[in-house]
Amino acid sequence: MSFSVTVLGCSGVYQTRELAASGFLVEIDDGRWLVDMGGGTWRNLLLQADYRDLKGVFLSHRHPDHTIDIWQLFHARHYGDLGGPETKIPLWAPRETLDRLSHFDEGITESFDLLPVDQNSKVKFGGARATFARMKHPPETYGVRIEHGGVALAYTADTGIEGDIDAIARDAQVFLCEATVQDSDEPWWGHMCASDAGRIAVRSEVGRLVLTHLRPDCDRELSLQQARRAAPGLEVHLASDGMKLELG
């Protein structure tokens, strides 16, 4: 069994010179899936894998820092060198997100099967199972839990502490958790600080906490310190582009 996740982007709100916006490449046995496609993730994907090998894409919500590079993948599949009639791949997302994408360019349906998800959905990623939980964020947003071979990967997407985070995070070997702001910042509705991430990770008894979606003006090392103080003894890391985490 092989199961890994590679960070394609981890910057919150917008990409920077150093970091792409949110996106992850999930590899399970011989299959590859994308989870979110913020700005800059397309280029980073091409450094890691052949886009023709992708089996599907999940977009957590409609905000551009999680979706904008889906159009790069669409153009590559639609106008690129796949040759002949396209074989569609699944694009799972909240219905609101799918409606926005198809309204912008209805041609997207020629490259993707648009499949709405909600908190009751169960999806197969090859031999793995993906389940979803509603997060607390202004548009309809879902976090995802991917289970394979008795281990789990959890990703919050964007959320405040009121999101149904425990439903995806419990006992996860790797917990990709948003940490947009820091303890001293004004609260930002629909987002969390690094200490929140640490406390939730402890409560959910995760194996490793990986902080993602840090606002670009944050002191990243300070966020890491705050999360570690809230989660003593837990393995805590900062996400960085190209980081690969093995789960199996």
Segments and roles (model prediction):
Residues I161-K244:
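Cap/insert and terminal regions of metallo-dependent hydrolase folds
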